[in-house]
Amino acid sequence: MKSLLDLFKQFTPDEHFDAIRIGMASPEKIRSWSFGEVKKPETINYRTFKPERDGLFCAKIFGPIKDYECLCGKYKRLKHRGVICEKCGVEVTQTKVRRERMGHIDLAAPCAHIWFLKSLPSRLGMVLDMTLRDIERVLYFEAYVVTDPGMTALKKLSIMSEEDYEAKRKEYGDEFIAKMGAEGIKDLLESIDIDLSIEKLRGDLTGSEVKVKKNAKRLKVLEAFKKSGIKPEWMVLQVLPVLPPDLRPLVPLDGGRFATSDLNDLYRRVINRNSRLRRLLELKAPEIIARNEKRMLQEAVDSLLDNGRRGKAMTGANKRALKSLADMIKGKSGRFRQNLLGKRVDYSGRSVITVGPTLKLHQCGLPKLMALELFKPFIFSRLEAMGIATTIKAAKKEVESGTPVVWDILEEVIKEHPVMLNRAPTLHRLGIQAFEPILIEGKAIQLHPLVCSAFNADFDGDQMAVHVPLSVEAQMEARTLMLASNNVLFPASGEPSIVPSQDVVLGLYYATRDRINGKGEGLVFADTGEVQRAFDAGEVELAARITVRLTEWSKPKDSDALVPTTALVETTAGRALLSEILPPGLPFSYVNKALKKKEISRLINVSFRKCGLKATVVFADKLLQNGFRLATRAGISIAIDDMLVPPQKAGIIERSEREVKEFEQQYVSGLVTAGERYNKVVDIWGKAGDEVSKAMMAQLSKEQVIDRHGQQVSQESFNSIYMMADSGARGSAAQIRQVAGMRGLMAKPDGSIIETPITANFREGLNVLEYFISTHGARKGLADTALKTANSGYLTRRLVDVTQDLVVTEEDCETANGSLMRAIVEGGEVIESLRDRILGRTAAEEVLHPENRMVLVPVGVMLDEDLIEELEAAGVDEVKVRTALTCETRYGLCAKCYGRDLGRGGLINLGEAVGVIAAQSIGEPGTQLTMRTFHIGGAASRAVIASRVEAKSNGVIGFSSTMRYVSNTKGELVVIARSGEIVIHDEYGRERERHKVPYGATLTVNADQNVKAGTVLAKWEPLTRPIITEFAGRTKFENVEEGLTVARQLDEVTGLSTLVVIDPKRRGAAKVVRPQVKLIDAQGNEVKIPGTDHSVTIGFQVGALIQVRDGQDVGPGEVLARIPVEGQKTRDITGGLPRVAELFEARTPKDKGTLAEMTGTVSFGKETKGKVRLQITDPEGHVFEELVPKEKNILVHEGQVVNKGESIVDGPADPQDILRLLGIEELSRYIVDEVQDVYRLQGVKINDKHIEVIVRQMLRRVVVEDAGESNYISGEQVERSEILNTNEALRAAGKIPAVYSNLLLGITKASLSTDSFISAASFQETTRVLTEAAIMGKRDELRGLKENVIVGRLIPAGTGLAYHQARKAKDAMDDAERRAIADAEAAEMAAQAEVPELDGSSVTASDAAAD
């Protein structure tokens, strides 16, 4: 009986494994898998449709084609289970064994595995130390390889052609052995002595860098072979496994034809060629024929494994390349990405969505028909439980007939059973949320309007999918974690996601505006009820200014109880009525103003922080209901008269046209260049457009009214278009400008600006030419969008892949490290406040009050809104907080270092997949970023040219440590530092603002001077860069020769002449001469730099205009020459998506700047080949030198002292340099700031945390500098956690630990170099990853999320983390228990054995076994 029950038991996969290993199979292993050899290429008999014996579908090898029935029909039914039929040789069993039983083909000649040959770098080449070209020549029978030189002068592994071989045979006879084809390669592989080779290579890790690198790689492979017990000769196949037939099916189509898997074709070819070769070898055919057949067999095997990898791909009947085994697993439609990482699921449906304004936030409307289909199993079980149906079949009938009882049951089943709604593309975790279904008529799903922004849904035909969680656990998780009312914040920024938009905003805005002299102005009411009655009676209008007695509930500082306070408040009727829905604890002041979209968002945010989740959700729903109602009552509409065209427009356009004409004249006269004219014209029209739109907004936003005293006053306008834009409901000033102002300048498809603007607007209408110009932009926009979506999706995919295994795994890693945060200030403006940067982070050290040094925040406390308000009040301007980068958790992150979970508002939970959330937060807004790289041209260049800085606040002036200046003859202070900054401190000495000042600027303030806001701090010439002397003396020119190094330029208009430094074209002089000036003192000696014996030498760059004469006396701070900035090409600024990708891929920028390698003094050496030799000498006298191309802009000069990591050559910084010279914290700051700049430009808010998490993953590998007593090879890249574990073990054993340095990898590189080969293989370059993993015999510890999804287990995150931890703990306990029992048994047996037996022996076998 038991065996019968076993039969029906479901086959359960064993989920209790902790790692997966991949390796290479030996011929023995392949034979052991096999159930028989496939000898014939036939598949099935075309008449009987039965598989041919010994063929590719043979039932004897692979199993029966009908359940429990042999092929000839002798044995049928269950009773003969396991019998092997003597007639047809088929085992009687289930037919599904045809999915798992493999066969094999014995190859008549060995064949190399193409993956190990052609997947770069060639593994065969690495092991044999031969080039790929040579191995290929041997394998494909073009050359011989010496496998055993014997006593001859030949070298092993040497290659010889046919002719050479014949000659050598004549010379040496049979002394040596040389072979062709895979046999030769196999012999070579067999002859490798791995241990010996390893020893030899370990001793050989010296010499040239190339050789060391090569040896290190070879050593790694050989050590892997040794460790995993894989023999190198297995890379050459002798036995080919055959895939089970049901995995490469043959399906009869109607009309007697068959659809077949390409693999069958490929196998057929291999079998045909193999049998032919076997026959030839038996017949002892001539060598050349056998050789040709062997080559063909090798090619057939290659095509089967990876078609098209070498030579032309094998094609089928229809000229299409056949799909080989490798193609099955790689790419988007391969096994990994199509079937393992993403699957289609049952119990799901999709339909169009419509708006459900009456729903509560946690509800959605589900069409009855859909619900009936989705909840079928639940309905069936209910019908059976009620006894209405006895079998599933009967229940099915009942449901299909649709009797009333079925609908009643559906209502019952659906109660409190959440369903999940998903809108594609699911860019972040709010793209799938759970709702409680409400049954509705019709066929469209109803969606709550407030969740639209999270789904990015609208109702113009969008569709959504519904999924039903089946198990109780799944329902529970959907309800607690995914219910829409539990996800009210965006995980990217912590801002509310349930913010009203469009009509709701308009309604609330309209109701909270105030109107001068509205009906009922000045009335006083006893309470809001009275206001409501007056409003209903038509005695008072919503916008009328009135006074009401209101009761507010607020929490005092020290208690949690709500206390009422009542007061008379001056407000409007609309606001008073709206105050009724405020949750207790939210002050009325938040609604006592015109509610625009931003204000409503703040209102919800404050409500969430002050009143909690539940109150906020109820409040949001009430806001929604009121918004819709009020918008309907307001009846705002658009008429053409609302689009007011400003009367000043004609004048502005006329003036601009005059200016453009003037410029055209100047251009014709040759006073300005074509480029200048174009820039100026674009500039003029840009200004004109702005002026028109200013005039238009001024006119739209104000209107004149009579107040109740009969005076004419102006108030904010009630113009419909203005209200829509002002409230944030729809449209913006830029859009209104196109309707009622002027459309302005348009861009060509290549991004350059057309200089003829569109002066008309949409109200006046466009003429044909204007219309044509404007189509450019529209079309470019559409093309851009399509490209952008694909690129953005790919960036998200790379980000997810690099961070997928980062999970919060412990509470606190107890590190003392952190990062110092202060507000980001640029050009004197606070771009990101300290509050935004430290909110929700953990303090890494005590935060003290700046004045009385009291502890405001102790270590390890998370900074929430209240604490930050205290810090702001105390005026703290920098805080050291813990960050994801400094966290010391080995695998994953700790909760304290991560801080607040932005999507939930509290400290992050254990098991939260912070990596994936970071990737989603950065990738989701990707589609909003621009694709274009901006040219600084036209409209953009106006903002760039600055010529002075002003103080923004009152305070005391200070200079940064890098600031250096000299006083010139007029007593002005001239800056001679390249990176000097002016800092303004308030009276407590806290930094308020910081301004960069360029080289050569004149300072208009002194240190410690008190300044008022608006004071000019420094000014400079914007369009030229000066060369300044720091010392006094008389100039002495060197190499300044007219016609050779300088040219005299005459200014036509003014008649003045200047010397311009030119590039010496005459290559006659061996050394390149460089024009320079030295200074001579009164005695005629050269002026030396104080403290050195360098003389002061100031070089002139090409393009400099020399401002002094030879022999002129100059004072410090005087300008010797000026370099026009115009001469420098304006660099393209990479913006938007490409910039973000560039940063995360850690690419070295083109034209990168150079940072100083060490702290020291700058000097210039001899020039070579158009390059300048720049040297830095440190205090110990070590010299570092760098060759800099002439056209680069060098930021330092002779004798200047630079600090390590300071910029010495202009250009964008290379992240690798920043990491090497300045360390991890600086690098992180650089990447975070640069990425944030791109997003900030688009108005997207992302928390710094997310970017830090990605930088952490980019830094997760290190490079071994010195192996110490570990098994690493220097130069090897290792996972950081692994080397830390190794070093701990080494220290514990008293050995020398390995020394390593940080390594920054781009996200693609980092994903591919992860320890998990399953994750890497499913990302990109599947073949290469799997080849490498197989050779190394890699183990995948299944730590990440992706690996676990692929092997089909719960992921180790969220609720799954607890499951896995519990499972591992239980396994460990079971192990310990087992060990204890075994020990006890052994002890018992030993005790028995100690009793002397008859022959006097006392030791038994049990002792040996116990050991």
UniProtKB/Swiss-Prot annotation:
Residues 1391-1411 are annotated as: Disordered. GO terms for molecular function: DNA binding; DNA-directed RNA polymerase activity; magnesium ion binding; zinc ion binding. Zn(2+) 1 binds at C70, C72, C85, C88. Its cofactor is Mg(2+); Zn(2+). GO terms for biological process: DNA-templated transcription. Keywords: DNA-directed RNA polymerase, Magnesium, Metal-binding, Nucleotidyltransferase, Transcription, Transferase, Zinc. It comes from the Bacteria. Zn(2+) 2 binds at C813, C887, C894, C897. Binds 1 Mg(2+) ion per subunit. Binds 2 Zn(2+) ions per subunit. One of its GO terms (cellular component) is DNA-directed RNA polymerase complex. Mg(2+) binds at D458, D460, D462. Pfam families: RNA_pol_Rpb1_1, RNA_pol_Rpb1_2, RNA_pol_Rpb1_3, RNA_pol_Rpb1_4, RNA_pol_Rpb1_5. Its EC number is 2.7.7.6. It catalyses: RNA(n) + a ribonucleoside 5'-triphosphate = RNA(n+1) + diphosphate. HAMAP family: RNApol_bact_RpoC. DNA-dependent RNA polymerase catalyzes the transcription of DNA into RNA using the four ribonucleoside triphosphates as substrates. NCBIfam families: rpoC_TIGR. The RNAP catalytic core consists of 2 alpha, 1 beta, 1 beta' and 1 omega subunit. When a sigma factor is associated with the core the holoenzyme is formed, which can initiate transcription. Belongs to the RNA polymerase beta' chain family. This is DNA-directed RNA polymerase subunit beta'. It comes from Verminephrobacter eiseniae (strain EF01-2).
